[in-house]
Amino acid sequence: MRSVYCGVVNTSNIDQEITLCGWVDRRRDHGGVIFIDLRDREGIVQVVFDPDAADKFALADKVRPEYVLRVTGKVRARSEATVNANMATGQIEVYGTDLEILNSAETPPFQLDEHTNVGEDVRLKYRYLDLRRDAMQQRLKFRSKVTNAIRNYLDDNDFLDIETPILTRATPEGARDYLVPSRTHDGKFFALPQSPQLFKQLLMVSGFDRYYQIAKCFRDEDLRADRQPEFTQIDIETSFMDEEQIMSVTEGMISKLFRELKGVELGEFPRMPYAEAMEKYGSDKPDMRIPLEMVEIKDLMASVDFKVFSGPASDPKGRVTAMKVPGGGEIPRKKIDAYTKFVSIYGAKGLAYIKVNDKTDLEGGLQSPIVKFLPQDVLQALLDRLEVENGDLIFFGADSAKVVTEALGALRCELGKDLNLYTCEWAPLWVVDFPMFEELEDGSLTALHHPFTAPSCSPEELSANPATALSRAYDMVLNGTELGGGSIRIHDQSMQQEVFRVLGIGEEEQREKFGFLLDALKYGAPPHGGLAFGLDRLIMLMTGASSIRDVIAFPKTQSAACVMTDAPGAVDKKQLEELHIRLRPVVAQPKEQG
C-alpha cells in the first residue's frame, strides 16, 4: 500500500512519486492550501493539497486528526523560508496528487503530543492511543533494537536460544506464585514461572552448555516503580565457566549495547564486596556516581555522655556512622527537617547533624544541637576522620545496624539527587561476595538469593557455621539499579541437600518439591552458573524513562490490573465448575472500635 515511511523521506527523494500511509497529526488550511502532517512510526512529513485538484482538495478538507490516510504525491524541496529545522523531514514536502481516507477517527480523549500532561490512568485506559505518541514509539523501537542486539551478541558467543515451560509447578523463589488451576487434575495447580531457574539448570545437565532466553516471568508481589506482575528477563546459563568468565561475557554484552545503541563507553566494571557496599554506601546496589560515603564512628562514641550515640555504640547489633556532605552547610534547616522525616520511613528516630562553619573553633565554629554533648577530643577525632572542610555538613546515624544502614543509604541517594552531586553519567560495578543466608526476625535463615546458589565453602564448613558463609553470587549494578544478578549454582547433590537442611527443608519436603532436581544432580551435572537481567529495567535506564510501565507496550497498573481490558475479570460459572472451583462470598471484616 505504501512505498516509503513518512519519517524517512528526505532530499534524496526529490522529484520522486511516493505513496505514504499514516495518521493525520495536524491539518491546517492556509489561504486555500491545505497542509497535512502525516505520521507513522518513523516520523512526520508534510503533505500539501491545493485547489487545482478539486476532488482531492475537497477530500483533504474533510480529514481530521487521527484519520488514517493513503497519500500519493511528488516530493519537492521546501522554499528556504518554509524549511522546518525542527523536523527530520523539514527540508522537503510532498505535493499530494491522490488521497484515500482509509478510516475516520473520533476526537481522542487526550492530545497525542509530548506537551500535554495526561494522567497515567487515562493513558493506560487508551494505551493504543498513548502508544502513537512519539516518546512511546521511540522507546519501543529502542527496546526492539536492544533485544535484537542481545540475540546477535549471544548467538556470536555460541549461546543457544531454548524455550522453557510457562506452565510449571510452584517452587519457593521469594515471591507469591500466580497459580493456574488444572481442569484435568482435580485440585491441582500449575504455577507461572518466577524465572526459568530450575529448567535452565536442567539444560546444563542435558549438555546444552550455553543457554539463553528472553523469557516472560511472573511474580505476584507488591508493585513499585520498577516492578510488574509479568516482566521480561534476559536469562543466561553456562557450564564449565567460573564467576569471572560469566561476568566477563555478560559485561561485554551490556558494554556493547551501550556502545552501539547509546554511543557510550561504560569502561571498567569494578568489583565491590557486599560487606563494603553495605558499610560505605548503605546498599547492595550502590550508586557510585554519588561521592558520599558512610564512615564508622562507633569507637568514638562508645563512652560519650550522649545516650543517642553511646547506646548503639555499646550494642553489638548497633551502628553509629557519619556521612560528610561537602558544601552541605548551605542546606537550610527546613530541608534538614524534611530529611529527618525522610529517614523516619526507614525506622530512624531522628537525624543528628553538625554544620562546620569553622573547623578550627570547636566551641563556636560547629553549629548543631548535639555539639554540647560531645567532648572536644571526640569532636576533633570526628573532624579528622571525616577530613571535613569549612562549609561541610555531617549527618549521623545511630540505631540498630539495619536501621542506620538503610536510612543513611537512602539519604545518600536523596542527597545525590537533590544536590546534583553526580560525578558522571554512568557508573557500573559488580557486587560480589554476598552472604549465603540472611537471618529472619525469628532467628531462622533464608537464602539471600535462592537455594540453588553455591556457597564458597565445603558442605562441612557450611554445616558448622552457615550464618557466616559467603555465596558465589554476583550482581551487576548501574547507577544504583540492579541490572542483573546471578551465581554459580550447586551441582553436587550432597551440597544441595545440605543447603536445604540449613533452610529447614526436610528430606520429605526436598523430595516432594525438588526431587527431579536432586535426581538430575546424580547423573553427572557439570559445574554451571548464570545470571538474569531485567530487560524492562535495562530499557528504562537506557531511555531515561521514569517507570518500566513506560517501556512496556501494555503494562499493568500498580494494583496489578489492566484498565484497558479490565483484567483480571470474572469468569462464568461453567468454567469454574470445570476447574472444580467454588468461590466463597467475600465477608466484610467488622471495623475495630476506637
Curated annotation (Swiss-Prot):
- E.C. no: 6.1.1.23
Which SUPFAM superfamilies does this one have? Class II aaRS and biotin synthetases, GAD domain-like, Nucleic acid-binding proteins
Q: Provide the transmembrane region boundaries.
A: none
Q: Which amino acids does the record list as binding L-aspartate? A: 173, 219, 449, 489
Biological process according to GO: aspartyl-tRNA aminoacylation
Region Aspartate, residue ranges: 197-200
Molecular functions per Gene Ontology: aspartate-tRNA ligase activity; aspartate-tRNA(Asn) ligase activity; ATP binding; nucleic acid binding
Question: What InterPro entries is this protein classified in?
Answer: Aa-tRNA-synt_II (IPR004364), aa-tRNA-synth_II (IPR006195), aa-tRNA-synth_II/BPL/LPL (IPR045864), Asp-tRNA-ligase_1 (IPR004524), Asp-tRNA-ligase_1_N (IPR047089), Asp/Asn-tRNA-synth_IIb (IPR002312), AspRS_core (IPR047090), GAD-like_sf (IPR004115)
Tell me, in one coarse class, where this protein mainly resides.
cytoplasm
Q: How does this polypeptide assemble, per the annotation? A: Homodimer.
Concerning its family, UniProt says: Belongs to the class-II aminoacyl-tRNA synthetase family. Type 1 subfamily.
User: What NCBIfam families would the database entry show?
Assistant: aspS_bact (TIGR00459), PRK00476.1 (NF001750)
Please identify the protein, giving its name as recorded.
Aspartate--tRNA(Asp/Asn) ligase
- Species whose genome carries this gene: Saccharophagus degradans (strain 2-40 / ATCC 43961 / DSM 17024)
